[in-house]
Amino acid sequence: MAQLVGIVLVSHSERLAHGLRDMLVQVAGEEVPIEAAGGTDDGGLGTSYDRILVAIDRADRGAGVLVLTDLGSAVLTARTVLEDRVANDAVLVDAPFVEGAVAAAVLAGTGAGLEEVTQAAVEARDVRKL
């Protein structure tokens, strides 16, 4: 099977990140590398540089990594991690956390490239619910 784009879910809540990951695995399958990076190292609400870094490295299977965040400071922490990484194969995407993640995971499962998967996440912002 071809290398698939990885997805990292950065949330202030460990439970939220893992819950969304569980949903994505059901939708896109186990083959898509999806990692959750939620909460702080001591189990509280917040974000962790180390958790994000480890999640990106785990999700990176050679086709690039899409990083999605829930709220403001998660963006700052994820951006810092990406700036510090030697490899530049991961991108931080301004997309809705849940809808963007679902769109990205489904497309990643088809073998689409990082640019296409990123675009799917971004375009999820325009999908109306009602």
Residue ranges with predicted function:
Residues 1-130:
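N-terminal loops that bind phosphate or other acidic moieties
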